Regions:
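Amphipathic, small/basic residue-rich leader segments at the start of a protein or domain
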Residues: 1-96, 113-117, 121-124
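Short, solvent-exposed loop/turn elements at beta->coil junctions and helix N-caps
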Residues: 65, 134-139, 165-166, 203-208
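Short glycine/proline-enriched turns and hinge-like loops at secondary-structure junctions
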Residues: 71-72, 141-145, 169-174, 211-212
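N-terminal glycine-rich flavin-associated loop
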Residues: 93-113, 143
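A short, Trp-centered hydrophobic/proline-enriched beta-strand micro-motif
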Residues: 125-135
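Flexible, small-/acidic-enriched active-site or ligand-binding loops
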Residues: 146, 196-215
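A structural signal for short hydrophobic beta-strand segments in well-ordered beta-sheet cores
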Residues: 149-152
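A short core secondary-structure module
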Residues: 157, 161-201
């Protein structure tokens, strides 16, 4: 068994490590780098993301045909390990949850039309996204089969009724993937933050920092 990384991946790994050391880790000791929820502040994030793009390290998990690096699991693991040496790392490379998982889902199953409208803006860093799945008890948490939110088709449109919580990034997201029950089972719906009929009731505090995580 060969435990060595291919040369092209190892070069990207080293490049990622050097970028994190030079541009990201030093920010952790600067109080103004943080927002009120202990994430990297949005202005600084935008600046670092521009540098990542210039270095050719943006969205390594996305196919080259959609402006990513097109890495497979081994390459992604190598680069993600380096990014996660900083709590700010994953989000700077567009590799933080929930965007990371949402991009993967959309790239796998969305139609081309849906990809252009919903996926590409996330890939480009123009918008952020969230996954609305978890519900208060007795609704679905880690078990989606328990989801209580219902969607019914009425007069040519879908009407969704339910309550979700612990929706990571909902406050800054523009694109949402929402899971609801239909007569055929669970269905994932795409919606934009500006669509009417929904609202955020409150931000739920948690124990510890809310820093962006990576997969």
């Amino acid at each position: 068994m060969d435990f060595y990384l291919p040369d092209n991946i190892d070069k990207l790994r080293i490049k990622t490590r050097n970028f994190v050391d030079k541009h990201i880790i030093p920010l952790e000791s600067v109080p103004s780098s943080y927002d009120n929820h202990e994430n990297i502040n949005e202005t600084l994030l935008s600046e670092i993301r521009d540098k990542v793009k210039l270095e050719g390290l943006w969205s390594p998990q996305i196919p080259k045909s959609r402006s990513g690096l097109g890495l497979g699991p081994i390459g992604m693991a190598a680069l993600y390990e380096e990014m996660n040496r900083s709590i700010f790392g994953p989000v700077c490379f567009n590799c933080a949850a929930p965007d990371d998982g949402n991009m993967y889902i959309l790239n796998k199953i969305a139609t081309e039309e849906q990809k252009v409208e919903w996926l590409d803006p996330i890939i480009n860093g123009d918008v952020r996204s969230s996954l609305a799945m978890t519900e208060p008890a007795p609704g679905g948490g880690s078990d989606p089969s328990m989801i209580k939110t219902e969607a019914t088709y009425q007069n040519g449109k879908w009407r969704i009724n339910g309550l979700k919580w612990y929706i990571t990034g909902a406050g800054v997201a523009s694109h949402f993937i929402l899971l609801a029950k239909t007569k055929d089972g669970l269905t994932a719906f795409l919606y934009h933050k500006d669509q009417p009929g929904w609202n955020i009731k409150r931000r739920i505090p948690i124990m510890g920092p809310e820093e962006h995580g990576g997969h």
